């Protein structure tokens, strides 16, 4: 629930109060039944739709401020809500409600020779802190995912999306969710983020940052609690010599241009040198016709003069815009070398028909999501059947890839005996 902050208190006191309330809410949430949680989630979806007009009006205020501040088109796209996106938010919440309840799931069980029966069982993490920037939908997605997994959540959205996030949160309040299950940080001062990163006196169990490189870097540098890091999406698409050209053209256009401002958008296109003379121009022509700026290596410029020269910086840049860097590589080995050198380990895709080539791509590239003959824009929790996601974790500890309800749980061991002692 929204905290009514007494601004005579300092920020540390305000945030400590938020933490105490979240910790108190986490205990009953951890033992809530599936029926109780699903009923609350469906009520939240209804409330979002009923508050549609208020949410859109709040979003217009945020968009006006973004235009006034000269924000990039990709930023504005992430910030924008419309009828279809609000419908998608509500549908995402309902999808989360239909997912199996992870809490209490027996992940593994076995018997010991001494007769002990051991079970590894999923449990909630406790209190999740989510720090995000310009995506107001995260308010609903994160709240719903955490609730489904039996966690309380503290949301700290960016000032750019403050009106939209507050309107969505107000709608969630109207759904009579468990008290303090979903709180939004009541102050805009960045010092509040610092307090969250300290853990709010042990209240926060994990932090999930969702935003730009500077935000994630700050969280990783300052956090005193575990972090599910969502780094930038420097995503690659590799077109192998065995690729079907028509398929490659469709996938390349979608991977880059469907939505340029999301983390799963392709930022670098790699083409097998063996088919550059036949495949490069058609693929780049499609991208250019769609409004994409092409930045190519010297070899690419020779075959496609309309491209602009790529710099070394381009290979490690997340554009979040209608720009793509393009290079030729010596087959799958060259693609693997380039990707492992420049990737942020988010998402990579290959278009190929040769099974051995695909196997090497899957085995030798260490990124959270690898796709074969499919667009990088499928790197999304909703597309994975998770209902929604808090982010794409690019680290290797605990959560990796889309962070959904299962990733928002831990586990404990239940050991059943019949009087055994070690002696």
UniProtKB/Swiss-Prot annotation:
Location of the protein in the cell: Cytoplasm
According to its UniProt entry, the protein's GO biological process terms are: L-proline biosynthetic process
Tell me what reaction this enzyme catalyses.
L-glutamate 5-semialdehyde + phosphate + NADP(+) = L-glutamyl 5-phosphate + NADPH + H(+)
Cellular component (GO) terms are: cytoplasm
Q: Which InterPro entries match?
A: Ald_DH/histidinol_DH, Ald_DH_C, Ald_DH_N, Aldehyde_DH_dom, G-glutamylP_reductase_CS, Glu-5-SA_DH, GPR_dom
Give the main localization category: cytoplasm
Which E.C. number(s) belong to this protein? Answer: 1.2.1.41
For this UniProt record, give its keywords in alphabetical order, as a comma-separated list. Amino-acid biosynthesis, Cytoplasm, NADP, Oxidoreductase, Proline biosynthesis
In which pathway does this enzyme or protein participate? Amino-acid biosynthesis; L-proline biosynthesis; L-glutamate 5-semialdehyde from L-glutamate: step 2/2
Top-rank EC class of the record's enzyme: oxidoreductase
Do you know which Pfam families this protein is assigned to? Aldedh
The terms under GO molecular function for this entry are: glutamate-5-semialdehyde dehydrogenase activity; NADP binding
Keyword Transmembrane helix in annotation: no
Purpose of the protein: Catalyzes the NADPH-dependent reduction of L-glutamate 5-phosphate into L-glutamate 5-semialdehyde and phosphate. The product spontaneously undergoes cyclization to form 1-pyrroline-5-carboxylate.
Listed HAMAP family = ProA (MF_00412)
Which PANTHER family does UniProt cross-reference here?
DELTA-1-PYRROLINE-5-CARBOXYLATE SYNTHASE (PTHR11063:SF8), GLUTAMATE SEMIALDEHYDE DEHYDROGENASE (PTHR11063)
Give the family per the record: Belongs to the gamma-glutamyl phosphate reductase family.
Give the NCBIfam families listed for this entry: PRK00197.1, proA
This chain's protein is named Gamma-glutamyl phosphate reductase
Q: Supply the source organism for this entry.
A: Brucella suis (strain ATCC 23445 / NCTC 10510)
């Amino acid at each position: 629930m929204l905290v009514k902050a007494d601004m005579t208190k300092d920020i540390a006191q305000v945030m400590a109060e938020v933490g105490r309330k979240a910790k108190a809410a986490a205990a009953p949430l951890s033992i809530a039944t599936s029926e109780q949680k699903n009923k609350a989630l469906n009520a939240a979806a209804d409330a979002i739709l009923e508050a549609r007009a208020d949410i859109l009006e709040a979003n217009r205020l945020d968009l006006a401020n973004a235009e006034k501040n000269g924000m990039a088109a990709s930023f504005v796209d992430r910030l924008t809500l419309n009828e279809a996106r609000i419908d998608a938010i509500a549908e995402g919440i309902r999808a989360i409600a239909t997912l199996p309840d992870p809490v209490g799931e027996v992940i593994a069980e076995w018997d010991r020779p001494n007769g002990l029966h051991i079970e590894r069982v999923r449990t909630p993490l406790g209190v999740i802190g989510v720090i995000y920037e310009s995506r107001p939908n995260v308010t609903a997605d994160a709240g719903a995912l955490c609730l489904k997994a039996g966690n309380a959540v503290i949301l700290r959205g960016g000032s750019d999306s403050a009106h939209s996030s507050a309107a969505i949160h107000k709608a969630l309040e109207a759904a009579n969710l468990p008290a303090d299950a979903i709180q939004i940080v009541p102050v805009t001062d960045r010092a509040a983020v610092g307090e969250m990163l300290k853990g709010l006196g042990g209240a926060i169990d994990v932090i999930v940052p969702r935003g730009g490189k500077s935000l994630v870097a700050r969280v990783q540098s300052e956090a005193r609690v575990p972090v599910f890091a969502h780094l930038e999406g420097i995503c690659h698409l590799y077109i192998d010599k065995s690729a079907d050209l028509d398929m490659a053209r469709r996938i390349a256009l979608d991977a880059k241009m469907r939505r340029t401002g999301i983390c799963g958008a392709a930022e670098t296109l790699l083409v097998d040198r063996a088919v550059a003379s036949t495949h490069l121009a058609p693929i780049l022509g499609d991208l250019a016709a769609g409004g994409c700026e092409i930045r190519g290596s010297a070899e690419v410029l020779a075959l496609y003069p309309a491209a602009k020269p790529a710099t070394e910086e381009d290979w490690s840049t997340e554009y979040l815009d209608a720009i793509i860097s393009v290079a030729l590589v010596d087959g799958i080995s060259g693609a693997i070398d380039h990707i492992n050198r420049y990737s942020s380990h988010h998402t990579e895709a290959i278009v190929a028909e040769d099974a051995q080539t695909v196997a090497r791509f899957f085995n030798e590239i260490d990124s959270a999501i690898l796709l074969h003959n499919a667009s990088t824009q499928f790197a999304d929790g909703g597309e994975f059947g998770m209902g929604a996601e808090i982010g794409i974790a690019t680290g290797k500890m605990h959560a990796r890839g889309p962070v959904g309800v299962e990733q928002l749980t831990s586990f404990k061991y239940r050991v059943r005996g019949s009087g055994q002692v070690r002696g």
